[in-house]
Amino acid sequence: MAVTKELLQMDLYALLGIEEKAEDKEVKKAYRQKALSCHPDKNPDNPRAAELFHQLSQALEVLTDAAARAAYDKVRKAKKQAAERTQKLDERRKKVKLDLEARERQAQALGSEEEEESGSARTLEQEIERLREEGSRQLEEQQRLIREQIRQEQEQRLTGMAKNPENKETPKLKLKWKSKKEAESQGGYSRDVLLQLFQKYGEVLNLVLSSKKAGTAVVEFATVKAAELAVQNEVGLVDNPLKISWLEGRPQSAMGHNHPGLSRGSVVSERDYESLVMMRMRQAAERQQLIAQMQQEDQAGQPT
């Protein structure tokens, strides 16, 4: 991470909302609170979220490293003193007109101060470059904790752990398939693959793969109709079918239909039957296209 003029102009303490004498643990606590509220994953509609999150990360890196923080404090102090001198000079100019000798002395003094400030800035840049090359373990750990907290919040919301009887439940389905925990292929089902399979039935609000149990995921639909269509028609990949069951928001009309397809006792019209056949044909074509695409990507990723 190279130093920027914007970073030198920034008040990192004010950005994190802490005192100048704050200890490392206070800096980290303030970072987690600020970064969690503006994390890009939680603010997809805020174009400045990513920029602010990056600035907070820079602040954490600088203020939790003793050498980088000392260099930054020196630059900050020099700028503050320069601003105070400028203010005093402005007030003095309103009363008297400085003669040439005074201006020459002032220019020499400012030149020396600017050289010192430039040296401090170079020191700060070197410290930040060192942090970039070595890698900031503290920053990575804090960001990992934030990602884990966001993932847990999403899983809790999808599985109904945060219960509120006043909220209207959105339909959620539980997906299962054969997959070994250590297998990187996840049984052929990644998040993108599952989204392609289920988005054709309607808007998917969220989809989370379980981090604890392999071959398990939860999909949340915007409408009950979309969830019903998925339960009735989706079978997944041919070589590794999906088992789909209701988790929340199951309508009364869906009671007794826990597997894809229509029940034996249901009566459908000829038009309904034709629609179902066409949907199954589209599903088969989409699955074949998806399998071919994955095979091409695997071949492209193999060394030649």
UniProtKB/Swiss-Prot annotation:
Keywords assigned by UniProt, alphabetized: Chaperone, Cytoplasm, Nucleus, Phosphoprotein, RNA-binding, Transcription, Transcription regulation
Principal place of residence: cytoplasm
Top-level lineage group: Eukaryota
Cell compartment(s), UniProt: Cytoplasm; Nucleus
This protein's name: DnaJ homolog subfamily C member 17
GO BP annotations listed: negative regulation of transcription by RNA polymerase II; spliceosomal complex disassembly
Modified residues (Phosphoserine): S112
